[in-house]
Amino acid sequence: MAVKKVLISLGHPAHFHLFKNINANLNNLGIETEFIIREKDVLENLLKNEDLAYYNILPKEKGSGFLALTWSILLRDIRLFKFCLRSKPDLIVGSTVEITHVGKLVNIPAISVGEDDMDVVPLFSRLAAPFSDCLVFPSICRMGKWTKKTLTYNSYQELAYLHPNHFRPDKKIVRKYFNPDYPYFILRLSALSAHHDKGIKGLDEETTNKIISFLAPHGAIYLTSEKKLQPEFERYRISINPIDIHHVLAYSQLLICDSQTMAAEAGVLGTPFIRMNDFVGKISYLNELEDIYQLGYGIAPSDKTRLFDVLTHIAGNRTKIEKNRLITCKVINKF
């Protein structure tokens, strides 16, 4: 049966970027697309900025506890089921658990897309992978017992939207916020509120304060955060249109974060990054970016000594920054 309509399910802002070019390509082929989302950070704003129609099946986040998560999945299953009965798509694709459940119920193929190893996201492995018709993941990922139903590719999700064929950094966009000719650093603090983030530590206030003090003599500091900040950090906070963040990231001297996605985005853009959280050493695609291609550093929250050794090496080090740009070009050409 020919595919005439595809339903794309988004559960994270990065998934908007992942699918935006795919969406355009499908439309150019005459295939109709629809978006289903749930509340997550700036996801809804990204679709609004691009004037893309969507249906939000979970306008308010339901909390992070087990009961809240169970109720959230049930609600999303029910609402997506009703939507599919009305819309009648030929294919469902995305990164959310509910597409696999509903796909089975309404007999519509569901393709799950991701980049985390299955042992890092055990809930997805238990609740989504068994019902998915196909899993599409980078070849570096550990897929465990789902290896046989996985279609792999030798690349990273981030290159679907940050490859030079799709993205060119523009200093004019950065100038809307500040002068990009003056050295600057980006700090990104994540909420770490996803189900697989339970018990995970990232950048704490004390470490953030010390990082700011260390970097201040070397350039401007701009901070973006998913969580509430202490008053002393507010003067560093900057509000950036979500659609512009990759331009800002591309010209930065360094990204320091506890976010997996933004670290990988910096890596493929050639911006050195320091990723500090308890996932360090556990996620294959980030291990590859950090250890094989040496585009960034993964540092455990407890290893403050190494953090400041790396900061000393990178801050103001134009050679390191230019080397990253060169390595990134070679990595991209490989893919």
Where are the regions that the model predicts?
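Donor nucleotide-activated moiety binding/catalytic core segment of transferases
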Residues: 76-80, 227-262
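Conserved donor-nucleotide binding/catalytic region of nucleotide-linked donor-dependent transferases
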Residues: 312-328
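Catalytic binding pocket for nucleotide-activated donors in carbohydrate/polymer assembly enzymes
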Residues: 268-313
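Conserved nucleotide-sugar phosphate-binding/catalytic loop shared by glycosyltransferases and other
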Residues: 10, 27-72
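Catalytic donor nucleotide-activated moiety binding site of glycosyltransferases and closely related
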Residues: 50-63, 105, 187-192, 209-241
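A conserved, positively charged/aromatic
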Residues: 111-114, 120-136, 249
